[in-house]
Amino acid sequence: MSKTIAINAGSSSLKWQLYQMPEETVLAAGIIERIGLNDSISTVKYDGKKESEVLDIPNHTVAVKILLEDLLKHNIIAAYEEITGIGHRVVAGGEYFKESAVISQQEIEQIEELSALAPLHNPAHVAAMRAFEEVLPEVLNVAVFDTAFHTTMPKHAYLYPIPQKYYTDYKVRKYGAHGTSHYYVAHEAAKVLGRPIEELKLITAHIGNGVSITANYHGESVDTSMGFTPLAGPMMGTRSGDIDPAIIPYLIANVEELKDAADVVNMLNKQSGLFGVSGFSSDMRDIEAGIQAHNPDAVLAYNIFIDRIKKFIGQYLAVLNGADAIVFTAGMGENAPLMRNDVVEGLSWFGIELDLEKNVFGNYGDISTAESKVRVLVISTDEELVIAREVERLK
């Protein structure tokens, strides 16, 4: 019996899902949180049960050991030998990786080298890879890159309008992110629409704590909102999205606690977006509650958020010369009907119309009116399944 674990590692977390392959059956899922902090928590979901335990988990290697022990303890597996593949989500693959790759020491070093492109993510991915190599040295490890799907972008879309030597010598360009999600929901959208993806023009909107919009032409990414790093694009939960780059030296020169570029980038990554503007939360549910309570900062944060998403969708309607569908996915994309309504309401000139009842009560499929010139879909993303499939493909 072949089992594959799909891993999404963060700096202090390890999210996982165990699949029976090739049947694609989810056997168990879980998350280990607060790695390296006090009161680490391991949560396992299996057979309709959910169990959590507070443990001492100082690093990712210990986290991996606990994950595997949990699988045995709860009789989810009978022996480690049943695990035949580990798939790792990797945010930044740069130009090294145009598709998923079997991991050796060389690949780990290259992923680590690309940490500047995803400083919040790649170091954690490397830590998880090394942990699995230490604990299960004989098992195949595969890296699945968020950036791989976007390698089809044309040069005029991925190059910045700066001297080309900065691309040729330093690889400064747009790489994008969330590619695994955009790939999955585009193909699922084609199924919902009952048309081959090779005929479709789609705008996919991955709206979670991170936000990215992608223009998909006939199954390929031709432009996307995240850039050299996942900091670019629309406003996000704690990330600013696009700002005038001249703001950075201005803040360094004038704000005492922002001593250098690293301080400013940290602020833009972790203290901005919905959290920074509202002053109290990066969670859209809290922002909506703040709006109900007539909090002006919550209203402002929400309005900026909606405005930035509409602008990117408008850009990509122009890039694609129209679209067959707009697809909402990820945490907010799937679960925030007010946000979807307000985004689409600003696109009515394009003949895009939501069915208000379907928008509120439908959680999958077409939520637009019969008259809408562009379909509006809600599709649940499943990056873990794509990762498991890639492991199976590379075995």
UniProtKB/Swiss-Prot annotation:
<dbReference type="GO" id="GO:0000287">
    <property type="term" value="F:magnesium ion binding"/>
</dbReference>
<comment type="function">
    <text>Catalyzes the formation of acetyl phosphate from acetate and ATP. Can also catalyze the reverse reaction.</text>
</comment>
<protein>
    <recommendedName>
        <fullName>Acetate kinase</fullName>
        <ecNumber>2.7.2.1</ecNumber>
    </recommendedName>
</protein>
<feature type="binding site">
    <location>
        <position position="383"/>
    </location>
    <ligand>
        <name>Mg(2+)</name>
    </ligand>
</feature>
<feature type="binding site">
    <location>
        <begin position="206"/>
        <end position="210"/>
    </location>
    <ligand>
        <name>ATP</name>
    </ligand>
</feature>
<feature type="binding site">
    <location>
        <begin position="283"/>
        <end position="285"/>
    </location>
    <ligand>
        <name>ATP</name>
    </ligand>
</feature>
<dbReference type="InterPro" id="IPR023865">
    <property type="entry name" value="Aliphatic_acid_kinase_CS"/>
</dbReference>
<dbReference type="InterPro" id="IPR000890">
    <property type="entry name" value="Aliphatic_acid_kin_short-chain"/>
</dbReference>
<comment type="subunit">
    <text>Homodimer.</text>
</comment>
<comment type="similarity">
    <text>Belongs to the acetokinase family.</text>
</comment>
<keyword id="KW-0479">Metal-binding</keyword>
<comment type="pathway">
    <text>Metabolic intermediate biosynthesis; acetyl-CoA biosynthesis; acetyl-CoA from acetate: step 1/2.</text>
</comment>
<keyword id="KW-0808">Transferase</keyword>
<feature type="site" description="Transition state stabilizer">
    <location>
        <position position="178"/>
    </location>
</feature>
<dbReference type="GO" id="GO:0008776">
    <property type="term" value="F:acetate kinase activity"/>
</dbReference>
<dbReference type="GO" id="GO:0005737">
    <property type="term" value="C:cytoplasm"/>
</dbReference>
<keyword id="KW-0547">Nucleotide-binding</keyword>
<feature type="binding site">
    <location>
        <position position="8"/>
    </location>
    <ligand>
        <name>Mg(2+)</name>
    </ligand>
</feature>
<keyword id="KW-0067">ATP-binding</keyword>
<dbReference type="GO" id="GO:0006083">
    <property type="term" value="P:acetate metabolic process"/>
</dbReference>
<dbReference type="InterPro" id="IPR043129">
    <property type="entry name" value="ATPase_NBD"/>
</dbReference>
<feature type="binding site">
    <location>
        <begin position="331"/>
        <end position="335"/>
    </location>
    <ligand>
        <name>ATP</name>
    </ligand>
</feature>
<feature type="binding site">
    <location>
        <position position="15"/>
    </location>
    <ligand>
        <name>ATP</name>
    </ligand>
</feature>
<feature type="active site" description="Proton donor/acceptor">
    <location>
        <position position="146"/>
    </location>
</feature>
<dbReference type="GO" id="GO:0006085">
    <property type="term" value="P:acetyl-CoA biosynthetic process"/>
</dbReference>
<dbReference type="InterPro" id="IPR004372">
    <property type="entry name" value="Ac/propionate_kinase"/>
</dbReference>
<keyword id="KW-0963">Cytoplasm</keyword>
<dbReference type="GO" id="GO:0005524">
    <property type="term" value="F:ATP binding"/>
</dbReference>
<keyword id="KW-0460">Magnesium</keyword>
<keyword id="KW-0418">Kinase</keyword>
<feature type="binding site">
    <location>
        <position position="89"/>
    </location>
    <ligand>
        <name>substrate</name>
    </ligand>
</feature>
<feature type="site" description="Transition state stabilizer">
    <location>
        <position position="239"/>
    </location>
</feature>
<dbReference type="Pfam" id="PF00871">
    <property type="entry name" value="Acetate_kinase"/>
</dbReference>
